[in-house]
Curated annotation (Swiss-Prot):
Highest rank taxon of the organism: Viruses
GO biological process: symbiont entry into host cell; virion attachment to host cell
Gene name in the database record: OPG105
Signal peptide: none
GO MF annotation terms: carbonate dehydratase activity; zinc ion binding
Name listed for the protein in its UniProt record: Cell surface-binding protein OPG105
Assembly and interaction partners: Homodimer; disulfide-linked.
Pfam families for the chain: Carb_anhydrase (PF00194)
Cellular component per GO, a single term: virion membrane
Induction statement: Expressed in the late phase of the viral replicative cycle.
Record's comment on post-translational modification: Apparently non-glycosylated.
Domain called Alpha-carbonic anhydrase: residue spans: 1-235
Record Gene3D superfamilies: Alpha carbonic anhydrase (3.10.200.10)
Length: 304
């Protein structure tokens, strides 16, 4: 049978719910970004440290790099689709089987060598303070085929979605150079339109009539599913899990952003200025409590 090319549209009604697909163990706490690149086609961040295990994985897969995809408009920029729903963008986290193979180049020659985690980006009304750390680096790689040190404290865990149930299937890398097992989180993370538009100002490696060309879009259209391709889901299929996030109460959203900002300050200054860091984490706890009671009140109001 022909190889299943990626990306694909995942039809939830055809996905096979498999309770044996246990939660993943994600160990990104020790991952550190080393460099950020404009490859002329996408943004790539190289990492040192970090790995995933558990779930259906036979052993640890080491994090290698992060790739970002987007479109001309905010309503379509993801490679993969869920029930034909198009997300604003997509992050791909590439891992390789270090226990079994000696290098990434060796691992990608085998169908159990690569694991790619997909995280969807959904444009909303507020900025993502963690994603902003990537956006802040883009000016240093505006030209095609350039790279720069990633000179900001960055915790990849903060870009994980709130729910980690996942779809999985055997496909290929986006450029079809190797087989890859895909792990796709249907729950997106929210970013602001201004953050995504910054990626469209990067220069492409291709020129048009001698003039600079921008990477206005770089997503790939989905391929038809082969007859023998199976898509599995790590839990009970719930259609609502794949629908776009509803708009939240504005004030609660603002409080949530403020809490994330305070937590970001805590992480940044814990070594440099402990007093400031302690004040920041106190605000995090206070805002968390406020959000908790407001969400309970909001839930009761909806029920009534």
């Amino acid at each position: 049978m022909p190889q299943q090319l990626s990306p694909i549209n995942i039809e939830t009604k055809k996905a096979i719910s498999n309770a044996r697909l246990k939660p993943l163990d994600i160990h990104y706490n020790e991952s550190k970004p080393t460099t950020i690149q404009n490859t002329g086609k996408l943004v790539r961040i190289n990492f040192k440290g970090g790995y995933i295990s558990g779930g259906f994985l036979p052993n640890e897969y080491v994090l290698s790099s992060l790739h970002i995809y987007w479109g001309k408009e905010d309503d379509y920029g993801s490679n993969h689709l869920i029930d034909v729903y198009k997300y604003s963008g997509e992050i791909n986290l590439v891992h390789w089987n270090k226990k079994k193979y000696s290098s990434y180049e060796e691992a990608k020659k085998h169908d159990d060598g690569l694991i790619i985690i997909s995280i969807f980006l959904q444009v909303s009304d507020h900025k993502n303070v963690y994603f902003q750390k990537i956006v802040n680096q883009l000016d240093s790689i505006r030209s095609a085929n350039t790279s720069a040190p990633f000179d900001s404290v960055f915790y990849l865990d903060n870009l994980l979605p709130s729910k980690l149930d996942y779809f999985t299937y055997l496909g290929t890398t986006i450029n079809h150079s190797a087989d890859a097992v895909w792990i796709i989180f249907p729950t997106p993370i929210n970013i602001h339109s201004d953050q995504l538009s910054k990626f469209r100002t990067l220069l492409s490696s291709s020129n048009h009539e001698g003039k600079p060309h921008y990477i206005t879009e770089n997503y790939r259209n989905p391929y038809k599913l082969n007859d023998d391709t199976q898509v599995y889901y790590s839990g009970e299929i719930i259609r609502a899990a794949t629908t776009p996030p509803a708009r939240e109460n504005y004030f609660m959203r603002w409080l949530s952003d403020l809490r994330e900002t305070c937590f970001s300050y805590y992480q940044k200054y814990i070594e440099e200025n402990k007093t400031f860091a302690i004040i920041a984490i106190v605000f995090v706890f206070i805002l968390t409590a406020i959000l908790f009671f407001m969400s309970r009140r909001y839930s009761r109001e909806k029920q009534n």
